[in-house]
């Protein structure tokens, strides 16, 4: 019988989601993230609050960074991640009318990086039929009050 199961990746995801929740809430945003979800492509959403009112909802996909995500000799980007292309296709195919963000979590250093996936950003990735795509990011993508 084909029944869903809990695997090692579910435990890694749970840790990443917990870190993301804490850091995002410290920055005065509400979030609804799902752990061990089987909803394809997205893990939940963040609500940005301004003057005690919800002003924007952003759909999110959360990924755990590997321990070795630093680039050693790059002038342009400091970090990289080989990402499943499903979240990029969500943007490309207009699956959600809300903006979509990729949340990358460094569980070792407890850092959260946030990349807004605009249609232009996704188009420039040239995902086409690929199942993974390497993306690059920097310290400026770290989630903070700015």
Model-derived regions: residue spans:
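Mixed-charge (Asp/Glu-Lys/Arg
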Residues: 1-40, 46-146
């Amino acid at each position: 019988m084909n029944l869903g199961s809990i695997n090692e990746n579910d435990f890694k995801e749970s840790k990443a989601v917990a870190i993301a929740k804490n850091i995002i809430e410290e920055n005065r945003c509400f979030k609804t993230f799902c752990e061990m979800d089987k909803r394809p492509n997205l893990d939940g959403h963040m609500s940005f609050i301004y003057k005690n009112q919800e002003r924007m909802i952003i759909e999110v996909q959360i990924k755990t960074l590997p321990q070795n995500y630093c680039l050693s000799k790059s002038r342009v980007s400091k970090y990289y991640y080989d990402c499943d292309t499903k979240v990029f296709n969500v943007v490309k195919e207009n699956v959600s009318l809300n903006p979509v963000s990729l949340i990358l979590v460094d569980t070792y250093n407890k850092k959260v990086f946030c990349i807004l996936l605009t249609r232009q950003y996704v188009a420039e990735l040239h995902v086409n039929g690929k199942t993974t795509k390497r993306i690059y990011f920097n310290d400026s993508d770290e989630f903070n009050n700015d």
